[in-house]
Amino acid sequence: MKTPPFNLFQPKTIEEAIEISSNFVKNDEQFDWIAGGTDLLPNYKWHLNTKPNVISLASIDELYRLDSKHIGAMVRLHDLANSEFSHPIIKKAAEGIASVLIRQSGTVGGNIALDTRCFWYNQAEEWRRSIDWCHKCDCDTSADCRVIPNQNELCVATYQADLAPTLLVLNAKIHLCGPEGSRNMPLSEFFELDGIKRN
């Protein structure tokens, strides 16, 4: 299957990436971030939750940093599993993620920011349309959760990433950057009990 057309932006710095994303937000334009693309691109091929604009992090050198205190968003899972700087439990978790080929492309940032999913939502749009929409699709209908119907207020799409539980056990912090500056926060505060929102 082919991906739908989208505009690809390749900033060279974090500041440039923030500026591009800020412009999209100001103009009410939808966009996605892409790191390794091992989850996003297959979803795009299936026409799942596609956006007209995609911002790639691949050209931002500082996101590849890996040492005993820092793991950049663009660090490949393969490199994390084989680094002398990685904590043994992180190495073990990283080497168990997916297949060798996916670990060669998949990134720490992409794994942590993985979208939530459920059996209903992760189907082709035609399949979903044949039944009805859901909370996560939010198509301005009074949709209901298809996994637990008739409760009409909670989305139970679950978080599927492999690396976050290990980082949570180690009390990891995440560094976030945006138009209003940067901040550090415990990784445990990054995740919300809401299947609709993407972390």
Each language-model region and where it sits:
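C-terminal structural segment of proteins
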Residues: 1-199
